[in-house]
Design a protein with these regions (language model features):
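Two-component system phosphorelay core
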Residues: 1-114
Length: 114
């Protein structure tokens, strides 16, 4: 039997909510609604090598992923993507880092969807 390792961790949002389950549900819903578009937009910016958009999208994602606990898995990747985009360099490295970000976000989405 294969073991499934979860990528999400709701400890941070649970602590932040202080027992407000509606808040937790709302934050998860926001992640489920917004993250697929964030991934799509970042992927398109990477394909177009639009470093300004890459920088902007990766910066925004850094602030949203802690709510579902995936910052420990992809936070550094997003920091590195933003840094490389700021320097307008490393397109291939950005693509590689993005693949990990995308995979983790897809796993998180699948874990959290109702």
């Amino acid at each position: 039997m294969a073991h499934f390792l979860k990528v999400t961790n709701l400890d941070y949002i649970t602590e932040l909510a202080k027992g407000d389950t509606a808040f937790i549900h709302e934050m998860i819903t926001i992640f489920l609604e917004e993250n697929p578009d964030e991934i799509k937009n970042l992927e398109q910016a990477i394909e177009e090598q639009d470093f300004e958009k890459i920088k902007s999208f990766s910066h925004h994602m850094k602030s949203t992923i802690p709510f579902v606990g995936i910052d420990v898995l992809i936070g550094k990747d997003l920091v590195d993507i933003e840094k490389l985009a700021t320097e307008k360099t490393g397109a291939n490295v950005i693509k590689t880092l993005f693949e990990n970000v995308k995979n983790v976000c897809e796993k998180a989405y699948n874990e959290l969807k109702p």
